[in-house]
Swiss-Prot record:
GO terms for molecular function: ATP binding; glutaminyl-tRNA synthase (glutamine-hydrolyzing) activity. The gene is gatA. This is Glutamyl-tRNA(Gln) amidotransferase subunit A. NCBIfam families: gatA (TIGR00132). Belongs to the amidase family. GatA subfamily. It comes from Geobacter sp. (strain M21). GO terms for biological process: translation.
Amino acid sequence: MEIFDLTIHELHEKLKAKEVSSVEATRAMLDRIEAVDSQVNAYITVTPEQALVQAQDADRRIAAGEIAPLTGVPVGLKDIFVTKGIRTTCGSRILENFVPPYDGTAVAKLKEQGAVIVGKLNQDEFAMGSSNESSYFGPCRNPWDLSCTPGGSSGGSAAAIAARTATATLGTDTGGSIRQPASHCGCVGLKPTYGRVSRYGVIAYASSLDQVGPLTRDVTDSALLLGAVAGYDPMDSTSVNTPVPDYVAGLGKGVKGMKIGLPKQYFIEGLDPDVKRAMDEAIALYKSLGADIREVSLPNTEYAVATYYIIATAEASANLARYDGVRFGHRAENARGLAQMYSKSRAEGFGPEVKRRIMLGTYALSSGYYDAYYVKAQKVRTLIQQDFLNAFKEVDVLLTPIAPTPAFKIAEKLEDPLQMYLSDIFTIPVNLAGTCGISVPAGFSAAGLPIGLQLVGKPFGEQEILTAAYSFERETQWHLKKAPL
């Protein structure tokens, strides 16, 4: 097995035993990126010089006996995290040459543990998309089939795990942007509860929905990485001051007696037959492990996509108003006057999907439509949250598909934005409810594309979904399969 194939916990044991150094692991990963990333396009920026300096520092820590779970481990970051001295583009032309003066909290926490940052990963522009096709830096490709998308918006973060060009990655999830690409690329992707991980230093898309989370090769790695970045942060007023448990310690509890709910609105006609088969097999496996499977109802699910695309775009239109060419980012040349400089900078800097969402959001917030759209959407969001809270009075965890289909072809849905939006129908409600969800590899389609299983937990119920995911992973081999790169 190559160094770049190892999980966080496997590499940690080798580093601890001094069987391999962090410099060797980092060089192996940088060589792997050079060998295969031209096919995948998972990275926007690779940082070999900084990575090797961090690796040398990690080796000094290890020699001194100071080794944390992520010390010396090569990780990639979605290009939405601000990184001191490293270009941060958010997949957009408007930030093509932006170099931040500080690290976001999640990045700082990784550095505190001695993780090695090998680069910044491709994504949909400003995290707006489900296929990684809206990136100014070109689409990222799915390592399982280079003609398919890896999903989005954290497409590069998932593709790098599948291509084995990072040991672990961080992404963000606003409406499914960690879980859907994890499903399409055959890796584990966890969206924590809103407020569990600080958003300080994450470029904002929709501030009441965005959440930081890990993408990894297995569930143990997911627990390790979540434990490293979770926790209260005074720099983020929405972060919640609750203790961070040792997620790894609770993985082996098993699911005997666990009540698992199947929301009837998620098992609908139109579900791809391969996805349905994978879900049926997963349900049967949980039954055999002693879980108590029961049907539940989330009656307002049908309104989730419409609600999301009003709230998220409204917040985006406000958040993206700051990009005007004055203090940072792209500035249009040859503008006559300030007003034209604003409009030209934005017209040149933003791509079509971002413009579409800004227009949708501005419309929803405009005085004549504010009550009819935005206020109504917030009321429906409250109903959706209540649906989940009611369901969790009966069950511990929900089991659902992640997406109606496996990964789709590049350009297949570009002409029909609504089809693209609907591909997030099973992930969006979890963000609206503000709770946690995980994608775990659960099989393959007839065409050999990965299929993910979603487990949804109560607010701050990450331990339960990690335990349920680990029990599933232990009984299956899906997470061990490798993309043919």
